[in-house]
Amino acid sequence: MYSNVIGTVTSGKRKVYLLSLLLIGFWDCVTCHGSPVDICTAKPRDIPMNPMCIYRSPEKKATEDEGSEQKIPEATNRRVWELSKANSRFATTFYQHLADSKNDNDNIFLSPLSISTAFAMTKLGACNDTLQQLMEVFKFDTISEKTSDQIHFFFAKLNCRLYRKANKSSKLVSANRLFGDKSLTFNETYQDISELVYGAKLQPLDFKENAEQSRAAINKWVSNKTEGRITDVIPSEAINELTVLVLVNTIYFKGLWKSKFSPENTRKELFYKADGESCSASMMYQEGKFRYRRVAEGTQVLELPFKGDDITMVLILPKPEKSLAKVEKELTPEVLQEWLDELEEMMLVVHMPRFRIEDGFSLKEQLQDMGLVDLFSPEKSKLPGIVAEGRDDLYVSDAFHKAFLEVNEEGSEAAASTAVVIAGRSLNPNRVTFKANRPFLVFIREVPLNTIIFMGRVANPCVK
């Protein structure tokens, strides 16, 4: 069911680009940007956020965990909690589609939260079937109507929870920007909500006359926001005279392990890839107390906290006889939550490879397979809420995502010297051992809200 007031203008179709960019090395404080009203403390009545169109599912979809009494964390808004769970549902579904398109020996890394944020900014201007498909694919239709109607407000609250953290040892920062063609007038409501909720200011560029210079300007902005780690995210010739708008979301994370690995204990060991081949990886080692559990069919789950404890890395390692691909297919938000709930602190021997993953891909094919079809179609797309006067000739020509992850003994790629004393390798046969010498899944999550910020697969840590 839709509620909208729009005008339709027919002309040559113009392109909208979405870029969901992410850098993670391993995490200051980002405030909600540029408004006299503090979105982080505001209530819904304080800031009206009414997009052009609202979609309500005729029948609210039941979710697998509906009816279960999963406890909402203290000082957490119920609507923010719902949104976080919706993002987790999208994360696991999208990952499975992406994994199906990859070779088992390929590394994968992405930020589902970054992707959801970029498309939430697009949802602001969407109507009709385009809006419905956005709601369904990103699982926004699984949350209550009250949350759905004000989803951008609660996205702001979620961002405040995630990014407004004072922690000198860790850093989690998000930056958004709209790059629009300077010849066009953009919808004022779209601009206001984008800036207030997502901190996405509009920067005019000359796509018509200077497409290549515009591409270079956007890539430079991304490079600056990711400390030079992500460059040339927009490929050559991706921007032309028909481009109207480029939406960019970046997330940067850098953190130090709560319990660091000693470089003196790192040594070369074999890592066994999915195809049966092996490679020589730098295997880190430490003994300590960590949250751990051996779950269904011998799969091991380990949680490694970063300093501050709010953000952790979760590793999922199948037993040697079970392929990671099978675990990937079976994984749901409910299964993952069940495993996390079962974790218990115990003494553990941890062997983990040092690795670096860079991953970049178009989101278009996977999202189309998931049902987001109209948004990418020049004939069907309905995005009247972006350009002034209800102009309805826009579509998304492509959406790009790029990610970077580096893990080492300190946690981050910029390792500092440390005076922490860590025991060397021992031969205690009674200790439980977690040895990641074969493909494993990796999640980086914000613990209180259980928000999946990053996720991926380490299939080959030997790639340079």
Curated annotation (Swiss-Prot):
Outcome recorded upon mutating residue 283 to I: In AT3D; type-II
Q: Which GO terms describe its cellular component?
A: blood microparticle; collagen-containing extracellular matrix; endoplasmic reticulum lumen; extracellular exosome; extracellular region; extracellular space; plasma membrane
Q: Which GO terms describe its molecular function?
A: heparin binding; identical protein binding; protease binding; serine-type endopeptidase inhibitor activity
Result of mutating residue 90 to L? In AT3D; type-I; Budapest-6
Effect of mutating residue 133 to K? In AT3D; type I
Q: What, per the annotation, is the impact of changing residue 198 to H?
A: In AT3D; uncertain significance; type-I
Recorded consequence of changing residue 179 to L: In AT3D; type-I
Q: Consequence of mutating residue 56 to C?
A: In AT3D; type-II; Rouen-4; lack of heparin-binding properties
- Segments forming a coiled coil: none
Signal peptide limits: 1-32
Substituting residue 190 to C results in:
In AT3D; uncertain significance
Q: Which residues bind heparin?
A: 81, 161, 177
User: Impact of altering residue 219 to K?
Assistant: In AT3D; type-II; Glasgow-3
Q: What does this protein do?
A: Most important serine protease inhibitor in plasma that regulates the blood coagulation cascade. AT-III inhibits thrombin, matriptase-3/TMPRSS7, as well as factors IXa, Xa and XIa. Its inhibitory activity is greatly enhanced in the presence of heparin.
Q: Describe the disease involvement stated in the record for this chain.
A: Antithrombin III deficiency: An important risk factor for hereditary thrombophilia, a hemostatic disorder characterized by a tendency to recurrent thrombosis. Antithrombin-III deficiency is classified into 4 types. Type I: characterized by a 50% decrease in antigenic and functional levels. Type II: has defects affecting the thrombin-binding domain. Type III: alteration of the heparin-binding domain. Plasma AT-III antigen levels are normal in type II and III. Type IV: consists of miscellaneous group of unclassifiable mutations.
The name under which this protein is listed is Antithrombin-III
Q: Which organism is it from?
A: Homo sapiens
Query: What lineage does the source organism belong to?
Result: Eukaryota, Metazoa, Chordata, Craniata, Vertebrata
